[in-house]
């Protein structure tokens, strides 16, 4: 968790999986019947809005993306910056999604999966390095 996020679990639960990171300016919120679940080793980029959705393991949600109630993002997905994922939308595993509304444009390559993991690992390493001086 970085600075200036808002997590509102006042209506339903919010679960953030081990190794995931939520960057500056994100808002995570729920509605009745719409809990929010973020899987393991997920990167939630700056200024992302997650609302009552599910994000699969090892995914990257790009800067400023919006994902709405009951949307389900599969594992190993990349959601592009500023993408809008509408309510009830199901994104299959290994998908690259861009646009507003978001559309699957192709499968994520092995090289991209590796880059997403390296990005996530970078944030995990930063947490280990700096958390001792922050808290």
Regions found by a protein language model. Name each.
Residues 3-97, 102-104:
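Structural signal for interior beta-strand "rungs" in well-ordered beta-sheet cores
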Residues 89-95, 100-135:
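Terminal amphipathic alpha-helical/low-complexity segments used for targeting or macromolecular assembly
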């Amino acid at each position: 968790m970085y600075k200036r996020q808002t997590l509102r679990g006042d209506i339903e639960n919010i679960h953030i999986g081990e190794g995931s990171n939520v960057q500056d300016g994100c808002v995570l919120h729920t509605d009745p019947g719409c809990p929010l679940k973020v899987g393991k080793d997920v990167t939630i980029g700056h200024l992302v809005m997650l609302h009552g959705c599910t994000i699969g393991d090892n995914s990257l949600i790009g800067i400023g993306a919006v994902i709405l109630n009951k949307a389900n993002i599969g594992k190993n997905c990349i959601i592009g910056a500023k993408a809008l994922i509408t309510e009830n939308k199901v994104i299959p595993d290994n998908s690259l999604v861009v646009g507003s509304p978001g559309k699957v444009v192709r499968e994520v390559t092995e090289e991209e999966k590796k880059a997403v993991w390296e990005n996530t690992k970078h944030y995990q390493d930063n947490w280990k390095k700096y958390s001792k001086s922050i808290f």
